[in-house]
Design a protein with these regions (language model features):
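Short, glycine/charged-enriched hinge/interface segments at domain edges or termini
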Residues: 2-4, 9-10, 43, 61-249, ...
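Conserved active-site and cofactor/substrate-binding residues in soluble primary-metabolism enzymes
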Residues: 4-11, 26-29, 33, 47, ...
Length: 454
C-alpha cells in the first residue's frame, strides 16, 4: 500500500481483528443475572419440554373413543371420578365411560388420551340432569357427570411430552447472547447457572485541555466532556465493562499515566478520544508507543479519517503468559460524531469478538433505504450519514413495495458536521454513501445500518 493511500473500512477492520487472540475466558453466572451475557458453552436440555403430557386447556381428561358418537344435539355422558390440578400428580386412572376434571398445565392422568374443553361440556347431577350451564368455569364443585357435546380426536387439547424439546436437544450455542427469551428457555428446563464469557474490561479516556468533567466550572474556554460518558455507554451497550480513566490534558505525561493505569488494571482494551491527529498537541500516539506498537491510520471514511490502533502491555508484563494477551489500543478522533462513527465501525465489532459473540452478531443489522434528501460527502471516502426513518403510528418503519425504508437527514443538511451532536441524538440509523459518490440525490437507494437494534 502506498503511503498516501487511505485504508478501506474493511482493511482497517481486518487489521484490528488480526490483533485479537480470542474471546475472554469463561466464568459461571447465575441465569437470573445473565441478561446480555454471552454463552461460552454448548448447552443441551437436561429434560424434555414439556416433561410430561399435560392439558392445553381447562376441561376433562377422557378416552377419545368414548366421545366418538357425541354431537351437539346428541351428547354422550361420562362419569366424573376425580380432578387433577396444575402441580398435582394424578392419582386416578381414566377408565371407559369416565372423565377426570383437569386444569390447564396439569399432567394427563393414566388411561386418558385426550382432553375435552370445558366449553364443550355441560355439568350433570347423578341422575343425568343439568347441574349448571354449558361451558361452566371448571373451578366450581365437581359435577357427578358431564355431557360431552362434540367428539374429540386422540391427543386433542393435549401438549405431548417433548413436543417442544426432546431431552438432549441443543438450546444454547456458544456465542449466543442471553436475551429474556433465551433465559426463559434455560430456566424452563431447570438450569440455574450458565458458563458465559467474561465481559471485556475496557478503559475509556477523554483528552483535551478544554474538556471539563462533571461538576467542573467551564470558564471562558471549557466544554463539558461528551465523549467520555458516550463511550462508557457505547462500551456497555456493546457487551463490555467500561472503566473510566478520567480526562487527560493535552500533555504527554498525563496521557501516558492514565493509559498506564488502564494497562495495570488489566483492561483488555483502552479507548482514547482526541489527540490522534498530527497537531502539536496530539500526543496520544506517542503515549501509546511507550507501551507497545501503534499505527496512525488514515481511513477512507467520513466522518472519522484519523484513527490509531495498536497493542500494548503493562509495565513488567513480558508477554510470557499466554493467558494474558496484549491490550488493544484505540485512538479515536475528538469530534463527538467522528468518535461515534469510528467506534461503530471498528471498536464495537472488536469488543463483541472479544466478548465471544457469534461472527454474525458483530455488526449492526443492515437494511435498504431510499434517501428523502440530497446528500453530499467527500469523494473517495465512505460516508456515514446520520438519518431517521419514516414510521407509522405504532413506530414501525414504513416500507415501500420493494421493502425499503425512507431515510431523512437527521438535523437536515446542516446537521451532518462531525461536531453536531444534536443530529446524532435524533438519528436511528446510519446511511452508507459509497466511496465512488460525492453526491446522491433524493430517491437514491443506499445501505442502512440500524443504530436502535443490536
Amino acid at each position: 500500500m502506498t503511503a498516501d493511500r487511505l485504508l478501506t473500512v474493511e482493511e482497517a477492520r481486518e487489521r484490528v481483528f488480526a490483533a485479537i487472540a480470542g474471546p475472554t475466558e469463561s466464568e459461571v453466572a447465575w441465569l437470573s443475572e445473565g441478561l446480555g451475557r454471552v454463552a461460552a458453552e454448548h448447552i443441551t436440555s437436561p429434560i424434555a419440554l414439556p416433561p410430561w403430557d399435560n392439558s392445553a386447556m381447562d376441561g376433562y381428561a377422557i378416552r377419545a373413543a368414548d366421545t366418538a358418537a357425541a354431537a351437539d344435539d346428541a351428547p354422550v355422558q361420562l362419569e366424573v371420578i376425580g380432578e387433577v390440578r396444575a402441580g398435582q400428580p394424578p392419582d386416578v386412572e381414566v377408565r371407559r365411560g369416565t372423565a377426570i376434571r383437569i386444569a390447564t398445565g396439569a399432567p394427563i392422568p393414566p388411561g386418558a388420551d385426550a382432553v375435552v374443553p370445558v366449553e364443550q361440556t355441560t355439568p350433570l347431577d347423578v341422575s343425568g340432569n343439568a347441574a349448571g350451564p354449558r361451558g361452566r368455569d371448571a373451578t366450581g364443585p365437581l359435577p357427578a357427570r358431564i355431557a360431552v357435546h362434540a367428539s374429540v380426536e386422540p391427543g386433542g387439547s393435549m401438549r405431548r411430552m417433548g413436543s417442544d424439546l426432546a431431552a438432549g436437544t441443543a438450546i444454547i450455542e456458544p456465542g449466543t447472547q442471553l436475551t429474556p427469551a433465551v433465559i426463559g428457555l434455560a430456566a424452563g428446563v431447570g438450569l440455574e447457572l450458565v458458563n458465559v464469557h467474561r465481559r471485556p474490561h475496557v478503559g475509556v479516556l477523554a483528552t483535551g485541555d478544554e474538556v471539563r468533567g462533571r461538576g467542573a466550572e467551564l470558564g471562558a474556554a471549557g466544554i463539558p466532556d461528551a465523549n467520555g460518558p458516550a463511550l462508557m455507554a457505547m462500551v456497555e451497550a456493546a457487551g463490555g465493562y467500561p472503566d473510566t480513566l478520567g480526562i487527560a490534558a493535552d500533555r504527554f505525561d498525563d496521557v501516558r499515566a492514565r493509559i498506564c493505569a488502564g494497562l495495570v488494571a488489566g483492561a483488555e482494551a483502552i479507548i482514547v478520544s482526541g489527540g490522534v491527529s498530527v497537531g502539536p498537541y496530539d500526543v496520544v500516539r506517542d503515549a501509546f508507543r511507550e507501551f507497545g506498537e501503534i499505527e496512525l491510520w488514515r481511513v477512507a471514511v467520513q466522518p472519522g479519517k484519523p484513527f490509531a490502533f495498536g497493542t500494548a502491555r503493562a509495565p513488567g508484563d513480558d508477554g510470557s503468559d499466554p493467558s494474558r494477551p496484549p491490550t488493544l489500543l484505540f485512538g479515536l478522533p475528538g469530534n463527538p460524531v467522528s468518535t461515534f462513527v469510528t467506534f461503530e465501525l471498528f471498536v464495537r465489532p472488536a469488543l463483541r469478538r472479544l466478548g465471544g459473540f457469534h461472527d454474525d452478531a458483530l455488526y449492526r443489522p443492515i437494511d435498504r433505504a431510499v434517501l428523502a434528501d440530497d446528500v453530499t460527502t467527500s469523494s473517495g471516502r465512505r460516508g456515514f450519514v446520520r438519518v431517521f426513518v419514516d414510521r407509522d403510528e405504532r413506530g414501525t418503519p414504513r416500507r415501500d413495495d420493494r421493502g425499503r425504508v425512507t431515510a431523512h437527514l437527521a438535523g437536515g443538511a446542516s446537521g451532518q458536521g462531525s461536531h453536531v451532536m444534536s443530529a446524532l441524538a435524533t438519528a436511528d440509523a446510519l446511511a452508507v454513501i459509497p466511496e465512488e459518490h460525492d453526491t446522491l440525490v433524493s430517491g437514491a437507494e443506499v445501505e442502512l445500518w440500524w443504530l436502535d437494534r443490536a
